[in-house]
């Protein structure tokens, strides 16, 4: 599932190719693609027609297109395989094309939502005074947000009394960090994923946040992480941060710091990758 860097890459592409364009027509080709829009596909298409798209926004892994002069926005759920592509009008339809948005201009391109597994979709929502779709107003700011409060995060982290990887994936504490980048940041910080958060000092929290930001910015610089053809940017191009991963997916390979074989452990229906030497497991107290 796309994490913050991948979603931000898509957002930047939409800002370049879709922002400030007026919708001429919307074609909903599969009902599941608008299942979160409870009024249905016809209502979704009708309410978008004639509206001007504002600058795309993002919080964590959530992406939306505000509609200018309204208090509404189109929220994009990419799911496991959703893609927002900007394609020429005459480009052949993708096999799993679900929604087509045509624009009232002569640029010759349209926005397409393509989704092989149909877990994703588009939906229209009212926005809060801060401009967020109301259904995601509870989501915490992400670490690349200029208004992210490091001190408040530290206090919340200690109060949560959980383990550090669970905290990094908790959208009420910090948004946008998924399994891949949590493992990468923890490896860089030399912290075991099961370390309790109650004992974190301010300097340790600051160091961890620094690594989270560094790994996300590094991924952004190369278009994100793509393990298959399902994650692409708006031009259909894959990212290649997977070539630079230090922890995730490297079970049995030597740690890039100490050469100890990396390990993988099942974790919350996912996997955690770590170095048993650099990232010592916390002591178990009885």
UniProtKB/Swiss-Prot annotation:
Enzyme Commission number(s) of this protein: 3.2.2.23, 4.2.99.18
UniProt xrefs under InterPro entries: DNA_glyclase/AP_lyase_DNA-bd (IPR015886), DNA_glyclase_Znf_dom_DNA_BS (IPR015887), Formamido-pyr_DNA_Glyclase (IPR020629), FPG_cat (IPR012319), MutM-like_N-ter (IPR035937), Ribosomal_uS13-like_H2TH (IPR010979), Znf_DNA_glyclase/AP_lyase (IPR000214)
Span of zinc fingers (FPG-type): 246-280
Positions with a binding annotation for DNA: 96, 117, 160
Manner of cofactor binding, per the entry note: Binds 1 zinc ion per subunit.
Single annotated GO MF: damaged DNA binding
Residue numbers annotated as active site: 2-3, 61, 270
Pfam families: Fapy_DNA_glyco, H2TH
SUPFAM superfamilies, alphabetized: Glucocorticoid receptor-like (DNA-binding domain) (SSF57716), N-terminal domain of MutM-like DNA repair proteins (SSF81624), S13-like H2TH domain (SSF46946)
Record note on quaternary structure: Monomer.
Family in the record: Belongs to the FPG family.
PANTHER family, alphabetized: FORMAMIDOPYRIMIDINE-DNA GLYCOSYLASE
Entry function: Involved in base excision repair of DNA damaged by oxidation or by mutagenic agents. Acts as a DNA glycosylase that recognizes and removes damaged bases. Has a preference for oxidized purines, such as 7,8-dihydro-8-oxoguanine (8-oxoG). Has AP (apurinic/apyrimidinic) lyase activity and introduces nicks in the DNA strand. Cleaves the DNA backbone by beta-delta elimination to generate a single-strand break at the site of the removed base with both 3'- and 5'-phosphates.
Protein name: Formamidopyrimidine-DNA glycosylase
Species assigned in the record: Streptomyces avermitilis (strain ATCC 31267 / DSM 46492 / JCM 5070 / NBRC 14893 / NCIMB 12804 / NRRL 8165 / MA-4680)
């Amino acid at each position: 599932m796309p994490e913050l860097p991948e979603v931000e890459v898509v957002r930047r592409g939409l800002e370049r190719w879709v922002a400030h364009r007026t919708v001429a027509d919307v074609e909903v080709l599969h009902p599941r693609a608008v299942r979160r829009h409870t009024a249905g596909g016809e209502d979704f298409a009708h309410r978008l027609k004639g509206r001007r798209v504002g600058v795309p926004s993002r919080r964590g892994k959530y992406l939306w297109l505000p509609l200018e002069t309204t208090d509404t926005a189109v929220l994009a759920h990419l799911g496991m395989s959703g893609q927002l592509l900007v394609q020429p009008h005459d480009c052949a339809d993708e096999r799993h094309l679900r929604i087509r948005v045509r624009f009232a201009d002569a640029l010759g391109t349209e926005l397409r939502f393509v989704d092989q597994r149909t877990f994703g979709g588009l939906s229209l929502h009212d926005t809060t005074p801060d401009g967020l779709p109301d259904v995601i107003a509870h989501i915490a700011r992400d670490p690349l947000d200029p208004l992210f409060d490091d001190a408040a995060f530290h206090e919340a982290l200690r109060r949560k009394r959980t383990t550090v990887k669970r905290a990094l994936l908790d959208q009420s504490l910090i948004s946008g960090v998924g399994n891949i980048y949590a493992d990468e940041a923890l490896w860089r910080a030399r912290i075991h994923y099961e370390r309790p958060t109650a004992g974190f000092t301010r300097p340790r929290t600051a160091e961890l946040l620094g690594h989270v930001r560094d790994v996300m910015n590094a991924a952004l610089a190369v278009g994100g992480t793509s393990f298959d053809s399902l994650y692409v940017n708006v031009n259909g191009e894959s990212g290649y941060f997977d070539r630079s991963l230090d922890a995730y997916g490297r079970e049995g390979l030597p740690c890039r710091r100490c050469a100890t074989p990396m390990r993988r452990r099942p974790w919350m229906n996912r996997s955690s990758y770590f170095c048993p030497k650099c990232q010592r497991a916390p002591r178990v107290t009885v």
